């Protein structure tokens, strides 16, 4: 390369250094100073990764003094270029030596990089275009936020998330029965709200014992990194901000923390967008004396726009408290309890009409009269005639039924505020089969119990019952903690034999404490060499993940997983169908939680529940109360908490030392009360609410679309190529999984989410659902989103030169492929992307300026191209400059015309959708007070704002590919 002192060059490998100046040429070496950073670089003259910077007539160059020159011509003297043209400030003719060019010039625009010889690899141009297409595809999907989470595609869950997640500041009560996935529904809504920009700051309030469960659930299922706040964290965060809640965007805390006035005041001042409250049935309220917990949530609900309340038992504390929770969501709508009761009584007529529409039979006269009265402001006669007709297409009849049903749902009931699915309305649950195994009480335990009784001591009734239910713990208190109770406990002998006879089955074992779980693992390992792993609260999240993964492995994995009560919270193992309850919890909700580890939607087999117990002990009496009184082993018991509250004292007395008559009396009373509560719940089922909550055919359609998206092989190929380009090392691990690690040749110094020790991922949803340690990769996953951002946010692939070997075209024929981006700057919360997302516009020009993009598709054209090295590419660009400059101007004309059309379509779509929704809600507001004025006002403001943003839409050249025909 010919070098001369003072010449300006740029580094091909370190473009961030800016414009360099040759300061020394000696022998075979050249030294370049980069004044913008003050750094020197020494290169071999023959192989220097440098590109000479020479501007052309028509370009604008900037001097180091800040003024610009419009270049008209250039001259060269002693190897240095002098630019001549018009001074930007004086308007007069001026000259500028290249040595006086601005050092900070960077070639960010594709045209500048192309003419400066900064030409990228051919495959990088392709991956950049694919990245822009993927971003556009994601932004335009009406299912945005539903595909990425690692959850099963359950229709009713996806329906609720789809309906609620799209709203501005949703305020709803999620009240599905146990096991139907309220946490997943809430997570899906949170994920949607964050991904679409409707929310940025989220506060989740949960019982103290569930903080960790929610933290794990949000991270593992939704890739959302929440922070758990307690008093210590608040004190620690005070160093960074006066209000600790401002130090994080996504926060989980307990209700106990917010009972403190100081912390509540700080939370009230923290500008949350969305508030989520789990176990909301604990919020007790009466008009005269609302509980402190209720007052805390009420204060927050008054200042936070979006509120999600979660409860499996909305009537647990009475119907008045249920009304109070609805009042938290919309105090204007639910202002009077008596009015609420009167309105509820009218729901029965609506439910009868809804059930008639939801079926297939012809409508009765009573149903028609009821519908006509309920929808009096609408002429429904044509729809009724269609439904009643004999020889009409069934699809048309079904459409008419669906339309009338939707009208009912819109106009009556609490459908927009309350969602509740029951096991009666959602199919797909397995049977629960209970097996009990009696064993004689060991003499060692009897001795420990006698010693304990002689020693006396003050203990509560509940503490005595807990001791009676876990004799091994009492035994260890007297013998010492290392006592090997498992060497004589007959339940352990039974467990070993059971596992040996079920070697091909995965078995989940749950015990009350971590010590018991660890002892059981030791017993299985030392006595029979049975592969088992433990899972308890003393382990870190990573350790629990590894244990769960070891249990989930089909080949070489653990046969049994032994969990403690707390350690198993939030984890589901529905790939197993055998559950061993080594002991029983005192609380019916905890029993249901244990069984719920396996009894979930998605469980493929009947669940076998095994309970080894000690005869004539508290264990047998509690078993009988659960089984005969509540039928809690074989069916879910929504009234379990109420029954325990009512019978707790009698139950504890029976457990500690009651006789058979007391037990029989307790069982009779419990059975009677259980039937009463069950009947009341059945009578209270709101059929209209259930129809609205599970979504019917619409929910199934959403799931089908998501399932099709999961099978998109094009997406998988694009993501794999993206990682290849970036330099991510990919190791096939088998079982549909890949291990990703940063390689030594990463294109970017950091890749957030990609750790040094690797990340295991899969594109298969079923694999991800069965393995907590494997991430599910979709286009919504942070690893994909980050990869797209790294490519599109850098200059990777913005310039490329290729050869087209085609003898049907004259050699030297030139094509210019231009990728423009149509975009409009707007806050993410405006949701402009729904109408005008960042859209790639492809223009393919021949040398005469004709756009061939409609005739020559990208994929077929790309397959015919061959790469050229950078130096040859740079020479070809230089030789083609006279042709290229006018083509760029022509390309922009075509692209601008396309943008104008896109903006017009976006405006029409926006106006049509929002006006239609506004008209619908305004008409509904007259008959359904559930429609909030805030929603209407939001839609009006959104239309005005979006119109302004569309007016400011922009066009930007994103990437260039110059193609020359060759016959060689």
From Swiss-Prot:
Enzyme Commission no: 3.6.4.-
Segments forming domain Helicase C-terminal: 491-655
Positions of disulphide bridges: none
Record flagged with keyword Ribonucleoprotein: no
Any single biological process term in GO: regulation of DNA-templated transcription
Pfam families: Helicase_C, RapA_C, SNF2-rel_dom, Tudor_1_RapA, Tudor_RapA
The protein's enzyme class: hydrolase
PROSITE patterns from the UniProt entry: HELICASE_ATP_BIND_1, HELICASE_CTER
Gene Ontology MF terms: ATP binding; DNA binding; helicase activity; hydrolase activity, acting on acid anhydrides
Assigned keywords, A-Z: Activator, ATP-binding, DNA-binding, Helicase, Hydrolase, Nucleotide-binding, Transcription, Transcription regulation
Residues annotated to bind ATP: 176-183
Domain Helicase ATP-binding residues, every copy: 163-332
Domain of life per record: Bacteria
Ribosomal protein as UniProt keyword: no
Chain span(s) of sequence motif DEAH box: 278-281
Function: Transcription regulator that activates transcription by stimulating RNA polymerase (RNAP) recycling in case of stress conditions such as supercoiled DNA or high salt concentrations. Probably acts by releasing the RNAP, when it is trapped or immobilized on tightly supercoiled DNA. Does not activate transcription on linear DNA. Probably not involved in DNA repair.
Similarity comment text for this entry: Belongs to the SNF2/RAD54 helicase family. RapA subfamily.
Subunit architecture: Interacts with the RNAP. Has a higher affinity for the core RNAP than for the holoenzyme. Its ATPase activity is stimulated by binding to RNAP.
Protein name as catalogued: RNA polymerase-associated protein RapA
Organism whose genome encodes this protein: Shewanella sp. (strain MR-7)
């Amino acid at each position: 390369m010919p070098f001369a002192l003072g010449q300006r060059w740029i580094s091909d490998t370190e473009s961030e250094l800016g414009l360099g100046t040759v300061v020394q040429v000696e022998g075979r070496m050249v030294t370049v100073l980069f004044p913008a950073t003050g750094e020197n670089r020494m290169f071999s003259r023959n192989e220097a990764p440098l590109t000479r910077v020479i501007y052309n007539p028509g370009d604008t160059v900037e001097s180091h003094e800040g003024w610009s020159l419009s270049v008209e011509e250039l001259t060269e003297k002693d190897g240095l270029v002098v630019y001549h043209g018009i001074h930007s400030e004086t308007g007069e003719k001026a000259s500028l030596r290249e040595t006086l060019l601005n050092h900070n010039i960077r070639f960010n625009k594709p045209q500048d990089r192309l003419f400066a010889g900064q030409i990228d690899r051919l495959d990088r141009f392709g991956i950049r275009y694919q990245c822009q297409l993927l971003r556009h595809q994601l932004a335009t999907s009406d299912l945005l936020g539903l595909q990425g989470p690692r959850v099963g595609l359950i229709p009713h869950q996806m329906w609720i998330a789809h309906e609620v997640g799209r709203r501005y500041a949703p305020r709803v009560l999620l009240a599905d029965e146990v096991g139907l996935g309220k946490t997943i529904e809430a997570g899906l809504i949170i994920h949607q709200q964050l991904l679409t920009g409707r929310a940025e700051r989220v506060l989740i309030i949960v019982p103290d014992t569930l903080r960790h469960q929610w933290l794990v659930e949000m991270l593992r299922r939704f890739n959302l990194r929440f922070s758990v706040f307690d008093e210590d964290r608040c004190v620690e965060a005070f160093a960074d901000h006066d209000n600790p809640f401002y130090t994080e965007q996504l926060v989980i805390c307990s209700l106990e923390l917010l009972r403190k006035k100081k912390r509540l005041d700080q939370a009230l001042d923290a500008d949350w967008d969305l508030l989520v409250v789990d176990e909301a049935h604990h919020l007790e309220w009466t008009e005269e004396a609302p509980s402190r917990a209720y007052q805390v949530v009420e204060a927050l609900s008054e200042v936070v726009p979006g509120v999600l309340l979660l409860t499996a038992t909305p009537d647990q504390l009475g119907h008045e408290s249920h009304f109070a929770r609805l009042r938290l969501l919309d105090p204007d709508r639910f202002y009077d309890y008596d009015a609420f009761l009167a309105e509820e009584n009218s729901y029965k007529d609506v439910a009868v009409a809804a059930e008639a529409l939801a079926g297939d039979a012809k409508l009765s006269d009573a149903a028609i009269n009821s519908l006509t009265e309920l929808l009096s402001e609408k002429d429904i006669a044509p729809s009724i005639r269609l439904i009643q007709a004999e020889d009409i297409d069934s699809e048309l009849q079904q459409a008419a039924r669906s339309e009338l049903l939707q009208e009912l749902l819109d106009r009556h009931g609490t459908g927009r505020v309350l969602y509740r699915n029951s096991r009666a309305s959602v199919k797909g649950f397995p049977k629960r089969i209970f097996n009990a195994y009696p064993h004689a009480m060991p003499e060692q335990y009897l001795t420990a119990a006698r010693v304990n009784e002689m020693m006396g001591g003050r203990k509560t009734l509940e503490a005595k019952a807990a001791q009676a239910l876990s004799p091994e713990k009492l035994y260890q208190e007297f013998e010492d903690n290392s006592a090997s109770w498992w060497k004589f406990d007959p339940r352990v002998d039974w467990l070993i034999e059971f596992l040996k006879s079920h070697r091909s089955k995965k078995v989940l074992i749950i015990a009350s404490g971590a010590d018991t779980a660890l002892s059981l693992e030791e017993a299985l390992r030392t006595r029979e060499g049975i592969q088992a792993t433990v899972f308890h609260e003393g382990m870190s999240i990573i350790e629990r993940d590894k244990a769960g993964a070891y249990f989930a492995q089909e080949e070489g994995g653990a046969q049994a997983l032994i969990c403690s009560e707390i350690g198993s919270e939030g984890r589901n193992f529905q790939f197993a169908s055998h559950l061993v309850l080594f002991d029983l919890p005192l609380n019916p909700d905890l029993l249901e939680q244990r069984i719920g580890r396996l009894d979930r939607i998605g469980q493929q087999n009947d669940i076998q529940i095994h309970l080894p117990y000690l005869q004539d002990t508290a264990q047998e009496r509690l078993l009988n109360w659960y089984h005969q009184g509540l039928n809690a082993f074989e069916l879910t018991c929504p009234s379990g908490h109420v029954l325990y509250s009512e019978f707790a004292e009698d139950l504890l007395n029976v457990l500690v030392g009651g006789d058979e008559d007391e037990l029989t009396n307790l069982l009779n009373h419990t059975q009677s009360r259980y039937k009463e509560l069950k009947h009341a719940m059945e009578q209270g089922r709101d059929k209209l609410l259930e129809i609205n909550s599970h979504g019917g055919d619409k929910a199934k359609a959403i799931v089908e679309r998501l399932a099709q998206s999961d099978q998109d092989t094009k997406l998988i190929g694009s993501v794999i190529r993206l990682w290849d380009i970036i330099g991510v090392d990919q190791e096939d691990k088998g079982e549909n999984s890949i291990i990703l690690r940063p390689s030594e040749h990463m294109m970017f110094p950091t890749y957030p989410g990609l750790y040094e020790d690797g990340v295991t991922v899969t594109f298969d949803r079923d694999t991800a659902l069965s393995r907590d340690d494997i991430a599910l990769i979709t286009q919504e996953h942070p690893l994909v989103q980050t990869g797209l951002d790294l490519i599109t946010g850098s200059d990777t692939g913005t310039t490329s030169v290729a050869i087209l070997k085609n003898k049907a075209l004259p050699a030297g024929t030139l094509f210019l492929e231009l990728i423009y981006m149509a975009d409009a700057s707007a806050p993410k919360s405006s949701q402009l992307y729904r109408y005008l997302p960042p859209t790639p516009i492809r223009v393919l020009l021949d040398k005469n300026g004709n756009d061939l993009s409609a005739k020559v598709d990208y994929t077929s054209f790309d397959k015919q191209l061959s790469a050229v090295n950078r130096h040859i590419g740079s020479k070809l660009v230089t030789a083609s400059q006279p042709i290229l400059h006018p083509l760029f101007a022509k390309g922009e004309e075509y692209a601008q015309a396309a943008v104008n059309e896109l903006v017009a379509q976006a405006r029409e779509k926006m106006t049509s959708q929002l006006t239609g929704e506004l008209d619908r809600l305004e008409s509904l507001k007259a008959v359904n007070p559930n429609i909030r004025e805030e929603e209407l006002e939001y839609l009006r403001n959104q239309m005005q704002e979006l119109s302004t943003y569309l007016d400011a839409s922009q066009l930007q050249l994103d990437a260039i590919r110059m193609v020359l025909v060759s016959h060689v």
